[in-house]
Each structure stands twice: as C-alpha cells, then as structure tokens.
C-alpha cells in the first residue's frame, strides 16, 4: 500500500513539473506577443512529452577531466531532495506526518546546496565552478532569512507541525497580519530557487549556463526537473504558511482544490516576475539580503516574541 501511495505522490509531481515548463513557455510567449509551443499535439500540449523523450534518449556526455562519480551523483541527489521535500506538506493530508515538518523542509533545502556545489566541482570547468559558487552563496545567504521568517511563523503557530497552520488560519490568513514577512518570504523563495530576477547562476553573458553547463541529456533533465519541482514546492509552502488551506473535514476534496488554486496562482506570479523584471546585479542581490531583509526579519521576529509576553498570553496549540 505504501508503494502505491508513493507512486501516487511522485507521478503527479512529475506531471506538474512537465506541464509547468509548457505553461512557462506559453506565458512568456503571450507576454512577448508570440504563440509559444503550438506544433507538437493540440495547442502544443505534447511538447513536454517530446522534450522528455528527446532528453532521456540522447547520449549522456561528460568532460574527460570530470570526476565521474560526483558528476553522476549530483543530479540524482538534486532530484531526490526535490521529491523528498514534498513528503510533509499537508495537501490537506501528508504522505508522512512529521512533528517537526518545517525543520525537515528547511534542512532539505539546505542539503540541495551540495548537489549544486558537487556539479560545479565535478565538471572541472571554470564556468560551472563560478556558477556553482554563486548559487551556493546565494542559497545559503537567503536561507538565513527563510529560517528567521519560519521561526516567526512558528511563534504565531505555537508548533513546528505544518498541519497546525491550517487550524491557526481558520479565521484569518496569516498574510493579513504578517504581510511584511510574506513579502520577504516570497522574494527569498525567488532567490532560493535561482529564478529571475535572481538567476545570477545562469548569467548567459558571463557564465553560459551556470553550474550545469557541462551536463547533457538525462543528467541535465534531472537538474531541470529538480528546479521546477522546487519552484512548485516553495509556492506550496507559501500557500500553507500564509494563505491557509481552507481545511474542511467533510469535503477534503475542496481543501485540496483550494490548495492547488493558490499554489497555481503563486507559481504563475513566478513566471510573471520572470517576464517583467531584468536580472539583479550580484552585489545588489547580497545587499538586499544582508542590509535590508536580515535586520527587518530579526526585528519582526523580536516583535512576535514580545507581543505574547506583553499581552500576558501564550501562542495557541502549546
């Protein structure tokens, strides 16, 4: 039974990732006054299938000077972590119900740094290594902000369990009372997933393609799938943390539909931002975090710690 549940959990994510690539290309096309993919299948709907077949049937090439084991392990690790991060998410039911679900997600997002670093190091290429170092510095930096924002949310929630967030937000979404945190969280997730305008790892003018420049065929497709799975997972997290999930014990299907619509809207915002904004300069990216976001999140965290004490009350669910 567990194997069936696992398959029912993995296959929809892979399908969602495949069609997200199509949606992105279509959206960018219409925003630039063109059609996007429209040849393969009706309205281009079979384009992700064609892309997948093409990538996984090509010969996986690698540089002669690369470190073979690490070169192969890096994309497998990236895809595995991108799939595992979904396990504690309540949609509204989880695959594995963890008491420390938020810490689990935070630790997995930290581990994803290793796959990027290994890929850049194992490629034995200057472009790949510089792209990997950029990605690692960016990801580790923004994880500081994400961790403090999560701590603030947990102080309001009174628990590290994700399911309790659904109960906390029964009357009002947390985005109403904590909109500065929600804004900084959303911008930080853009940086965490290396998306525009923070896609400094893929600066075409100076780094060709970033840390995955030496990858082709299957291993490249794994990195691609991992990136888009992380995008959907981060938006699912945003929906759970700040937009609730409209928990309805009688009609769980409605809860799932509500969660899906919120995640779809947030993911569409990712694509809209990509079409609208130019790439940041690297020093501006770091300045935004260390000089703006970090002091603000620390101040707000202290605020949420002091409010219950000042009002002589305790958070719910303790």
From Swiss-Prot:
It is a multi-pass membrane protein. Keywords: Electron transport, Membrane, Mitochondrion, Mitochondrion inner membrane, NAD, Respiratory chain, Translocase, Transmembrane, Transmembrane helix, Transport, Ubiquinone. One of its GO terms (molecular function) is NADH dehydrogenase (ubiquinone) activity. It comes from the Eukaryota. Its EC number is 7.1.1.2. Its main location: mitochondrion. GO terms for cellular component: mitochondrial inner membrane. It is found in: Mitochondrion inner membrane. Pfam families: NADHdh. One of its GO terms (biological process) is mitochondrial electron transport, NADH to ubiquinone. InterPro entries: NADH_UbQ_OxRdtase_su1/FPO, NADH_UbQ_OxRdtase_su1_CS. The chain crosses the membrane at residues 2-22, 70-90, 100-120, 136-156, 172-192, 223-243, 253-273, 294-314. Coiled coil: none annotated. The keyword Cell membrane does not apply. The keyword rRNA processing does not apply. It catalyses: a ubiquinone + NADH + 5 H(+)(in) = a ubiquinol + NAD(+) + 4 H(+)(out). Belongs to the complex I subunit 1 family. Core subunit of respiratory chain NADH dehydrogenase (Complex I) which is composed of 45 different subunits. Core subunit of the mitochondrial membrane respiratory chain NADH dehydrogenase (Complex I) which catalyzes electron transfer from NADH through the respiratory chain, using ubiquinone as an electron acceptor. Essential for the catalytic activity and assembly of complex I. This is NADH-ubiquinone oxidoreductase chain 1. The gene is MT-ND1.
